[in-house]
Amino acid sequence: ALNAIMPTFLLLAFGYFLKHKNFVSSEFLKQTNTLTFKFFLPFLLFNNIYKTEITEAIDGMTFTIAVGSLLLLFAVLCVVVPRVVREPKQRGVIIQGIFRSNYVIFGVSLVTNVFGAEEAAAASILSAVLVPMYNVLAVIALTVFTGGGKVSLKKTLKSIATNPLIIAALLGVFASIIKLRFPAFLETSLRDVSRLATPLALIVLGGDFSFRKLKGNMRIAGVTVFIKLVVIPLVFLPIAVLAGSRGPSLLALALAWETPVAVSSYIMAQQAGADGELAGQLVVLSAVCCIPTVFLMIFILQSMALL
């Protein structure tokens, strides 16, 4: 478990060190983040999927649990949160903060750390389903419950259709189905480029981290992150285990519930006229708190011989 989580923590810490010691600028981090999102992460997803036998990598049960748990969680949050949160601008932010995860960066990398790149296809394929669902549900939550500005569903659907991560994952599935193979030199280049994705993504995330963003709203942010990282996995993980999920598929499911709040949730909250400050705090606090919670989760699952 320590070997799985420490590389992630060290890369985040390295990014924080580089930025706060002025070795890199905010502009550099912004440009690197764009490169990573548009090129390196798509290469990683495609490379993880296209050489995999899809039917062996992930089964219908995993998809059913992932989609079913997300929709159930969203429905419950839409009923409960408006009843217990008084501030309208915080309701949509809290809803998306609990269900929405930074799955592509943390989920795929941690499955790779535990099982190796060959077994990371389950997490990569699952991202093709979860990423568009996260975006659509976030738009609904922010539009219906915020009462401020509006997030365009049409624009969001367009962004989903042109999302490099989703396109790469779907192309990987198609390439796997037709059993596409590249010449050795292209496979080597594809592998080398894909290896840049996770380190760069985590370094950029660490560089963007600021303890100052944690000031204010700590009580409500703390409760939200606790529900996300502790309560939700405790509810859904036993269901996945009882359903027979094991190994890479189980870890991929677990990380769909356990990983930090997606960075893009902060931007969407601002666009919707919601509490952008709280959204940013949820991103930062969940990134800090996920290190021990993910470690404990992996340790417990390994101790029970489920991974």
Predicted segments with their positions:
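Alpha-helical transmembrane segments of multi-pass small-molecule/ion transporters
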Residues: 1-307
